[in-house]
Amino acid sequence: MSLILALLLQVGPNPLSGGLPDDTLVRDRPARSGVPGEDGSATSAWLEQCFSQIAEDPARAHTMAQIRRNETKGADRVLANHCLGTAASELGLWEDARTAFIAAREETPLDETRARARFAALAGNAALASGDAEGAITWLIPAEADARAADAAALAALAAMDRARALVMLKRGEEALEALEAATTLAPERSEGWLLKATLLRRLERLAEAQTAIERAAVLAPGDPQVGLEAGVIAVLTGREAAARASWQSVLVLAPGSPQAITATDYLAQLGDAEETAAREEDSPPS
């Protein structure tokens, strides 16, 4: 048991690591208020084509967007950079993605705060994915501020979550927790914020609070294998091995063959069989 405890406390599942652009950020189109009707329709059609091309051939979409960016201006150029950044993200070209999203933000009118927030968040996320935590924070702070100004709570929460990830990378755990408090306040219905909060609290050894957060995540996303994995880790660290076993076994049912299932299988093997678990719990003093 002590070996498992040490292993899980140090490692465990880590949804706090740098991530990829959230689909709600990528797919939500920026405003085109300055584009006349006919041109707006053409712009919209081009953007749909470019996004469809990303799914089929991201390298070709990347080239299409580069050409479009170089040949256009105004709203057309903003949307070309949007697609360019998304294609670059799909290809793992994080610096290209960051540059494109920053350009899209800088060319978006100041009064279109929601679009500017989105592009800043995407730039920050690209920086995070490349391992540049400081660079990520540079863009995630204005992303959150602009999203709040636009009354876009979900978008502000996403920026706060990525800011928390960046702060964890910089070993600034308490600041990261503040960011996650903001995220769960802004978007209490999103399970991801509660999962990240539970994971960070567990790593800070604040296990009672971690349990509360993971229970909330489980209510919001009962079918999320990452939630089940984290719930099991918190359970074993608080001496509830039977509960940990149940959580990890649920991961095998929810997502067989997934990375989470592979991790759960490894944890279950370390835990031993059910009879050994029951015997250990009977021998343990009440908490």
Where do the model's predicted regions map?
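Helix-start (N-cap) detector for alpha-helical repeat units in TPR-like alpha-solenoids
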Residues: 43, 78, 117, 154-157, ...
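Terminal, low-structured helical/coil segments at or just beyond the last alpha-helical repeat
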Residues: 23, 245-287
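Canonical tetratricopeptide repeat
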Residues: 83, 122, 155, 162, ...
